[in-house]
């Protein structure tokens, strides 16, 4: 697997830290989750905004890190939902990021479970969890990584299987790509 996006349901800072670390250890191209659009367009016209971003992500190649969209001045924009939809539509593995400082293992486990349910509802695949600011022992069935990330984390992520769910938008993008190739 080579395409990832960080989704941090509770902390834009955790998303930024995890994204920076992933970009450093993976050494892949980055593409913005709002490439070619704005948060306002994404909130008000997602049916036209999302396909444009999917095309930009696919143009970046199979080895890419999508820099996640974050909170915006337009409060109608749900950055978590956008990032999960983009992950599903581009077959990017979701790396959940949480600020673990001062959080109990029980609370983090509940937050991870809730975020995974939300990802599943969007047809996105969670491939790992990144914790910032401490690392309580967690019992989850995906790799749990802590900052700073090293080569072992990169190898773990590269070894994950690519998501296989096919959303209507991913199917459409596949057809367009094949038509252009012919």
What are these regions (language model features)?
Residues 1-128, 133-143, 148-182:
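ATP-dependent carboxylate-amine ligase catalytic core
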């Amino acid at each position: 697997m080579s395409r990832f996006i960080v989704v941090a349901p509770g902390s834009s800072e955790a998303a930024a830290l995890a994204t920076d670390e992933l970009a450093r250890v993976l050494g892949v191209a980055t593409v913005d989750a709002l490439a070619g659009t704005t948060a306002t367009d994404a909130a008000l016209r997602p049916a036209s905004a999302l396909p444009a971003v999917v095309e930009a992500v696919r143009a970046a190649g199979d080895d890419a890190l999508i820099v996640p969209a974050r909170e915006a001045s337009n409060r109608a924009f749900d950055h978590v939902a956008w990032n999960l939809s983009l992950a599903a539509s581009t077959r990017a593995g979701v790396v959940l990021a949480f600020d673990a400082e001062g959080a109990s293992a029980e609370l983090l486990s509940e937050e991870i479970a809730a975020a995974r349910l939300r990802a599943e509802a969007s047809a996105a695949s969670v491939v790992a969890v990144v914790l910032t600011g401490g690392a309580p022992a967690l019992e989850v069935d995906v790799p749990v990584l802590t900052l700073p990330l090293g080569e072992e984390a990169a190898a773990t992520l590269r070894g994950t299987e690519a998501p296989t769910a096919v959303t209507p938008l991913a199917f459409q993008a596949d057809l367009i790509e094949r038509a252009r190739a012919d």
